[in-house]
Protein backbone atom coordinates (compact mmCIF):
# COMPACT_ATOMS: atom_id res chain seq x y z
CA UNK A 1 0.00 0.00 0.00
CA UNK A 2 1.01 3.65 -0.45
CA UNK A 3 0.15 6.61 1.73
CA UNK A 4 -0.75 9.55 -0.51
CA UNK A 5 -1.30 12.12 2.22
CA UNK A 6 -1.29 12.30 6.00
CA UNK A 7 0.43 10.08 8.53
CA UNK A 8 -0.84 6.55 9.15
CA UNK A 9 -1.79 5.89 12.77
CA UNK A 10 -0.69 2.28 12.60
CA UNK A 11 -4.18 0.93 13.14
CA UNK A 12 -5.29 -1.90 10.85
CA UNK A 13 -7.40 -0.98 7.86
CA UNK A 14 -10.77 -2.56 8.51
CA UNK A 15 -12.92 -2.23 5.44
CA UNK A 16 -15.34 -4.44 3.57
CA UNK A 17 -14.84 -4.65 -0.20
CA UNK A 18 -17.73 -5.93 -2.26
CA UNK A 19 -17.26 -8.89 -4.57
CA UNK A 20 -17.10 -6.78 -7.72
CA UNK A 21 -14.24 -4.68 -6.34
CA UNK A 22 -12.36 -7.81 -5.27
CA UNK A 23 -12.78 -9.38 -8.71
CA UNK A 24 -11.59 -6.20 -10.44
CA UNK A 25 -8.48 -5.97 -8.26
CA UNK A 26 -7.73 -9.65 -8.82
CA UNK A 27 -8.05 -9.29 -12.60
CA UNK A 28 -6.12 -5.99 -12.76
CA UNK A 29 -3.34 -6.04 -10.16
CA UNK A 30 -1.98 -2.71 -11.43
CA UNK A 31 -5.12 -0.98 -10.18
CA UNK A 32 -5.78 -0.02 -6.58
CA UNK A 33 -8.55 1.09 -4.26
CA UNK A 34 -8.23 4.65 -2.95
CA UNK A 35 -9.15 4.88 0.72
CA UNK A 36 -9.69 7.82 3.05
CA UNK A 37 -9.55 7.78 6.84
CA UNK A 38 -11.85 9.98 8.89
CA UNK A 39 -10.04 12.37 11.20
CA UNK A 40 -13.03 12.22 13.52
CA UNK A 41 -13.41 8.53 14.28
CA UNK A 42 -10.57 6.87 12.34
CA UNK A 43 -12.98 4.94 10.14
CA UNK A 44 -12.10 4.16 6.53
CA UNK A 45 -14.15 4.74 3.40
CA UNK A 46 -13.55 3.95 -0.25
CA UNK A 47 -13.08 6.66 -2.88
CA UNK A 48 -13.09 4.23 -5.77
CA UNK A 49 -10.92 2.00 -7.87
CA UNK A 50 -8.18 3.75 -9.76
CA UNK A 51 -7.91 4.21 -13.47
CA UNK A 52 -4.86 5.98 -14.90
CA UNK A 53 -6.84 9.22 -15.28
CA UNK A 54 -8.42 8.97 -11.83
CA UNK A 55 -5.08 8.32 -10.17
CA UNK A 56 -3.46 11.27 -11.95
CA UNK A 57 -6.22 13.59 -10.78
CA UNK A 58 -6.10 12.37 -7.17
CA UNK A 59 -2.34 12.83 -7.01
CA UNK A 60 -2.54 16.26 -8.66
CA UNK A 61 -5.20 17.45 -6.22
CA UNK A 62 -3.11 16.33 -3.27
CA UNK A 63 -0.13 18.27 -4.65
CA UNK A 64 -2.31 21.39 -4.66
CA UNK A 65 -3.39 20.93 -1.05
CA UNK A 66 -1.10 23.70 0.19
CA UNK A 67 -2.47 26.25 -2.28
CA UNK A 68 -6.20 25.44 -2.23
CA UNK A 69 -8.27 26.51 0.75
CA UNK A 70 -11.12 24.24 1.87
CA UNK A 71 -14.46 25.22 0.36
CA UNK A 72 -13.09 28.25 -1.49
CA UNK A 73 -15.20 29.32 -4.47
CA UNK A 74 -13.29 32.25 -5.96
CA UNK A 75 -9.92 30.73 -6.87
CA UNK A 76 -9.84 31.26 -10.64
CA UNK A 77 -6.77 29.06 -11.16
CA UNK A 78 -8.41 26.22 -9.26
CA UNK A 79 -11.59 26.50 -11.32
CA UNK A 80 -9.55 26.58 -14.53
CA UNK A 81 -7.83 23.38 -13.45
CA UNK A 82 -11.14 21.53 -13.16
CA UNK A 83 -12.68 22.73 -16.43
CA UNK A 84 -11.19 19.97 -18.64
CA UNK A 85 -12.69 17.35 -16.33
CA UNK A 86 -16.28 18.47 -16.93
CA UNK A 87 -17.74 15.87 -19.26
CA UNK A 88 -14.92 13.38 -18.59
CA UNK A 89 -15.62 9.76 -19.49
CA UNK A 90 -14.92 8.77 -15.88
CA UNK A 91 -18.14 9.83 -14.17
CA UNK A 92 -16.30 10.43 -10.89
CA UNK A 93 -14.06 13.05 -12.47
CA UNK A 94 -17.01 14.61 -14.25
CA UNK A 95 -18.88 14.86 -10.96
CA UNK A 96 -15.83 16.26 -9.20
CA UNK A 97 -15.54 19.03 -11.79
CA UNK A 98 -19.24 19.79 -11.52
CA UNK A 99 -19.05 20.08 -7.73
CA UNK A 100 -16.17 22.55 -8.04
CA UNK A 101 -17.56 24.70 -10.85
CA UNK A 102 -21.17 24.45 -9.72
CA UNK A 103 -20.48 26.38 -6.50
CA UNK A 104 -18.46 29.12 -8.18
CA UNK A 105 -19.80 32.69 -8.30
CA UNK A 106 -21.93 33.49 -11.33
CA UNK A 107 -19.21 35.72 -12.76
CA UNK A 108 -16.80 32.79 -12.80
CA UNK A 109 -19.39 30.50 -14.36
CA UNK A 110 -19.81 33.05 -17.16
CA UNK A 111 -16.06 33.27 -17.63
CA UNK A 112 -15.66 29.52 -17.91
CA UNK A 113 -18.71 28.86 -20.08
CA UNK A 114 -16.95 29.44 -23.39
CA UNK A 115 -14.46 26.69 -22.61
CA UNK A 116 -17.08 23.97 -22.17
CA UNK A 117 -17.68 21.97 -25.38
CA UNK A 118 -21.17 22.23 -26.81
CA UNK A 119 -21.50 18.46 -26.68
CA UNK A 120 -20.82 18.45 -22.93
CA UNK A 121 -23.53 21.04 -22.36
CA UNK A 122 -25.98 19.08 -24.49
CA UNK A 123 -25.26 15.95 -22.45
CA UNK A 124 -25.83 17.77 -19.17
CA UNK A 125 -29.03 19.33 -20.46
CA UNK A 126 -30.59 16.32 -22.14
CA UNK A 127 -29.58 13.16 -20.28
CA UNK A 128 -31.93 12.30 -17.38
CA UNK A 129 -29.06 11.12 -15.17
CA UNK A 130 -27.82 14.71 -14.99
CA UNK A 131 -31.16 16.21 -13.99
CA UNK A 132 -29.89 17.51 -10.65
CA UNK A 133 -26.85 19.08 -12.35
CA UNK A 134 -28.82 20.88 -15.02
CA UNK A 135 -28.74 24.37 -13.54
CA UNK A 136 -25.03 24.82 -14.23
CA UNK A 137 -25.43 23.77 -17.85
CA UNK A 138 -28.37 26.17 -18.28
CA UNK A 139 -26.32 29.09 -16.96
CA UNK A 140 -23.52 28.21 -19.35
CA UNK A 141 -25.95 27.84 -22.23
CA UNK A 142 -26.92 31.46 -21.67
CA UNK A 143 -23.34 32.45 -22.53
CA UNK A 144 -23.32 30.60 -25.85
CA UNK A 145 -22.77 32.58 -29.04
CA UNK A 146 -24.63 29.96 -31.08
CA UNK A 147 -28.02 31.24 -32.22
CA UNK A 148 -29.53 27.78 -31.77
CA UNK A 149 -28.56 27.83 -28.09
CA UNK A 150 -29.90 31.34 -27.60
CA UNK A 151 -33.16 30.33 -29.26
CA UNK A 152 -33.37 27.32 -26.96
CA UNK A 153 -33.11 29.61 -23.93
CA UNK A 154 -35.92 31.87 -25.18
CA UNK A 155 -38.17 28.97 -26.20
CA UNK A 156 -37.67 27.06 -22.96
CA UNK A 157 -38.43 30.12 -20.84
CA UNK A 158 -41.58 30.80 -22.86
CA UNK A 159 -42.67 27.18 -22.46
CA UNK A 160 -42.11 27.28 -18.71
CA UNK A 161 -44.18 30.45 -18.47
CA UNK A 162 -46.95 28.86 -20.51
CA UNK A 163 -47.16 25.75 -18.33
CA UNK A 164 -46.41 27.41 -14.99
CA UNK A 165 -43.32 25.27 -14.35
CA UNK A 166 -40.82 26.43 -11.75
CA UNK A 167 -38.34 23.56 -12.30
CA UNK A 168 -34.94 25.15 -13.03
CA UNK A 169 -36.80 28.41 -13.67
CA UNK A 170 -34.22 30.55 -11.86
CA UNK A 171 -31.47 29.20 -14.13
CA UNK A 172 -33.51 29.66 -17.32
CA UNK A 173 -34.48 33.20 -16.30
CA UNK A 174 -30.82 33.97 -15.57
CA UNK A 175 -29.86 32.59 -18.97
CA UNK A 176 -32.52 34.70 -20.68
CA UNK A 177 -31.11 37.92 -19.24
CA UNK A 178 -27.61 36.78 -20.25
CA UNK A 179 -28.89 36.30 -23.81
CA UNK A 180 -31.11 39.38 -24.17
CA UNK A 181 -29.97 41.81 -21.48
CA UNK A 182 -32.47 44.55 -20.67
CA UNK A 183 -34.91 43.10 -23.20
CA UNK A 184 -34.77 39.85 -21.25
CA UNK A 185 -35.62 41.71 -18.05
CA UNK A 186 -38.62 43.24 -19.82
CA UNK A 187 -39.70 39.81 -20.99
CA UNK A 188 -39.58 38.48 -17.43
CA UNK A 189 -41.61 41.46 -16.27
CA UNK A 190 -44.40 40.76 -18.74
CA UNK A 191 -44.40 36.99 -18.29
CA UNK A 192 -44.06 36.92 -14.51
CA UNK A 193 -43.60 40.05 -12.43
CA UNK A 194 -46.72 41.90 -13.59
CA UNK A 195 -48.84 38.77 -13.98
CA UNK A 196 -51.25 38.50 -11.05
CA UNK A 197 -51.78 34.78 -11.65
CA UNK A 198 -48.17 33.77 -10.97
CA UNK A 199 -47.34 31.60 -7.97
CA UNK A 200 -44.80 32.70 -5.39
CA UNK A 201 -42.31 29.97 -6.30
CA UNK A 202 -42.23 31.23 -9.89
CA UNK A 203 -41.84 34.84 -8.83
CA UNK A 204 -39.10 34.04 -6.34
CA UNK A 205 -37.18 32.14 -9.01
CA UNK A 206 -37.31 35.17 -11.30
CA UNK A 207 -36.28 37.48 -8.44
CA UNK A 208 -33.29 35.23 -7.81
CA UNK A 209 -32.27 35.46 -11.47
CA UNK A 210 -32.58 39.24 -11.57
CA UNK A 211 -30.67 39.60 -8.32
CA UNK A 212 -27.81 37.46 -9.61
CA UNK A 213 -27.44 39.65 -12.68
CA UNK A 214 -27.69 42.93 -10.80
CA UNK A 215 -24.99 41.80 -8.39
CA UNK A 216 -22.72 40.70 -11.23
CA UNK A 217 -23.30 43.73 -13.48
CA UNK A 218 -23.87 47.13 -11.89
CA UNK A 219 -25.25 48.52 -15.16
CA UNK A 220 -28.28 46.23 -14.78
CA UNK A 221 -29.19 47.41 -11.29
CA UNK A 222 -31.36 50.28 -12.51
CA UNK A 223 -33.52 48.16 -14.86
CA UNK A 224 -33.72 45.39 -12.27
CA UNK A 225 -34.81 47.89 -9.62
CA UNK A 226 -37.55 49.14 -11.93
CA UNK A 227 -38.62 45.54 -12.48
CA UNK A 228 -38.79 45.15 -8.71
CA UNK A 229 -40.98 48.27 -8.55
CA UNK A 230 -43.47 46.78 -11.00
CA UNK A 231 -43.40 43.51 -9.10
CA UNK A 232 -44.32 45.35 -5.89
CA UNK A 233 -47.20 47.05 -7.66
CA UNK A 234 -48.60 43.62 -8.53
CA UNK A 235 -47.31 41.35 -5.75
CA UNK A 236 -46.53 43.51 -2.68
CA UNK A 237 -46.35 40.42 -0.45
CA UNK A 238 -42.93 39.67 -1.98
CA UNK A 239 -41.35 42.87 -0.68
CA UNK A 240 -39.31 40.94 1.95
CA UNK A 241 -37.57 39.10 -0.89
CA UNK A 242 -36.38 42.40 -2.39
CA UNK A 243 -35.26 44.59 0.48
CA UNK A 244 -31.80 43.03 0.83
CA UNK A 245 -30.99 44.13 -2.71
CA UNK A 246 -32.61 47.52 -2.26
CA UNK A 247 -30.51 48.16 0.84
CA UNK A 248 -27.32 46.95 -0.88
CA UNK A 249 -27.99 49.26 -3.84
CA UNK A 250 -29.09 52.13 -1.58
CA UNK A 251 -32.40 52.45 -3.40
CA UNK A 252 -34.34 54.53 -0.89
CA UNK A 253 -37.01 55.49 -3.42
CA UNK A 254 -39.11 52.41 -2.57
CA UNK A 255 -40.23 53.70 0.82
CA UNK A 256 -43.90 54.09 -0.09
CA UNK A 257 -44.24 50.57 -1.48
CA UNK A 258 -42.20 48.98 1.29
CA UNK A 259 -44.25 50.79 3.93
CA UNK A 260 -47.48 49.60 2.35
CA UNK A 261 -46.18 46.03 2.21
CA UNK A 262 -45.04 46.22 5.82
CA UNK A 263 -48.50 47.21 7.01
CA UNK A 264 -50.16 44.49 4.91
CA UNK A 265 -47.78 41.82 6.25
CA UNK A 266 -48.05 42.81 9.91
CA UNK A 267 -48.94 39.22 10.90
CA UNK A 268 -45.50 38.00 9.77
CA UNK A 269 -42.86 39.14 12.28
CA UNK A 270 -39.89 38.26 10.07
CA UNK A 271 -41.35 40.20 7.15
CA UNK A 272 -42.10 43.16 9.41
CA UNK A 273 -38.53 43.10 10.70
CA UNK A 274 -36.87 42.99 7.26
CA UNK A 275 -39.11 45.70 5.85
CA UNK A 276 -38.68 47.81 8.96
CA UNK A 277 -34.92 47.50 8.58
CA UNK A 278 -35.14 48.94 5.07
CA UNK A 279 -37.33 51.80 6.29
CA UNK A 280 -34.94 52.61 9.13
CA UNK A 281 -32.00 52.68 6.73
CA UNK A 282 -33.99 54.87 4.37
CA UNK A 283 -34.89 57.26 7.18
CA UNK A 284 -31.25 57.50 8.25
CA UNK A 285 -29.95 58.01 4.71
CA UNK A 286 -32.61 60.55 3.82
CA UNK A 287 -32.20 62.45 7.07
CA UNK A 288 -35.95 62.57 7.65
CA UNK A 289 -38.17 61.28 10.39
CA UNK A 290 -39.18 57.63 10.39
CA UNK A 291 -42.36 57.18 8.32
CA UNK A 292 -45.52 56.70 10.36
CA UNK A 293 -46.79 53.13 10.34
CA UNK A 294 -50.30 52.77 9.01
CA UNK A 295 -52.81 49.99 8.87
CA UNK A 296 -53.92 48.49 5.58
CA UNK A 297 -52.16 49.66 2.42
CA UNK A 298 -52.83 53.38 2.63
CA UNK A 299 -50.18 55.44 0.83
CA UNK A 300 -48.13 58.02 2.77
CA UNK A 301 -49.39 61.56 2.76
CA UNK A 302 -47.88 64.02 0.31
CA UNK A 303 -45.85 65.63 3.07
CA UNK A 304 -44.28 62.27 3.95
CA UNK A 305 -43.36 61.60 0.34
CA UNK A 306 -41.71 65.01 0.09
CA UNK A 307 -39.63 64.40 3.20
CA UNK A 308 -38.50 61.03 1.84
CA UNK A 309 -37.30 62.51 -1.40
CA UNK A 310 -40.32 61.62 -3.54
CA UNK A 311 -42.34 64.08 -5.56
CA UNK A 312 -45.83 64.60 -4.09
Can you say where each PLM-predicted feature lies in the sequence?
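Mixed-charge (acidic/basic) macromolecular-recognition segments
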Residues: 81-91, 96-103
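Eukaryotic acidic, Ser/Thr-rich intrinsically disordered low-complexity regions
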Residues: 267-312
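Basic, polyanion-binding surface patches
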Residues: 1-47
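Solenoid-like repeat scaffolds
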Residues: 86-90, 122-129, 155-165, 190-200, ...
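Amphipathic alpha-helical scaffolding segments comprising HEAT/armadillo-like alpha-solenoid repeats
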Residues: 75-84, 107-123, 147-159, 181-193, ...
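Short, structured interface segments
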Residues: 38-69
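Structural detector for internal amphipathic alpha-helices that build alpha-solenoid repeat scaffolds
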Residues: 61-72, 95-111, 132-146, 167-180, ...
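N-terminal "cap/leader" segments of large eukaryotic alpha-helical scaffolds
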Residues: 59-88
